[in-house]
Swiss-Prot record:
This is Uridylate kinase. Its EC number is 2.7.4.22. It is an enzyme of class 2 (transferase). One of its GO terms (molecular function) is ATP binding. Pathway: Pyrimidine metabolism; CTP biosynthesis via de novo pathway; UDP from UMP (UMPK route): step 1/1. It is found in: Cytoplasm. Inhibited by UTP.
Amino acid sequence: MKTLVLKISGKFVSPYDTPLVEGYAKTLEALRRKYKLAVVVGGGSVARKYIELAPPSKGLKDLIGIEVSRLNALLLSMHTPSAKKVIPKSASEVLELWDGEDILIVGGLQPGQSTNAVALVVAELVGADLVVNATTVDAVYDKPPSQPGAKRIEKIKARELQRLLESFDWKNEPGRYELMDSIALQIAERSKIPIAVIYGGEPERIPSIVEEEAWGTLILP
């Protein structure tokens, strides 16, 4: 049985959309029947609101974002019967809690690290074969997808993607980590972990997308 890490944008797991949270819970149960499964949840718009109200220290803003992401992870775990109800707060706790049987759901771990990076750290720790990034866009594009003429990239190397994202002039700010940050890509490269990017707004489609490998973009290590 292969091991899968599913990264879910915090936008899709929030107290403002119970049906979407419940939809993800059903998706996790479906995936668990075929894969050993760990899940990493972002902070989303709730985290960004708290971060806006936080003191100017980026470290403190990160801490607030981490706490919100853990709360989102706990919310999802409560809706998912096969999930552990304890949210790890460190890499060592991930190792202690991981058994390959129950679904392990994780939020943020430490300041300066996006939940995309956390997903790759978790993937390293549990020996995952693949990270699936269920995000707010359906794929990686050759320029910001909001711009006219943006073209979908079917496959791209992690190092090439890092250069591409740098050309977009996106900044890694607390609560504003875009698509995939450099730490996540470096971990993917060093541990040879592929990342599949898909649209996460329709969780009921994710099991078939994974089964058919119908990725928006496949990021190769």
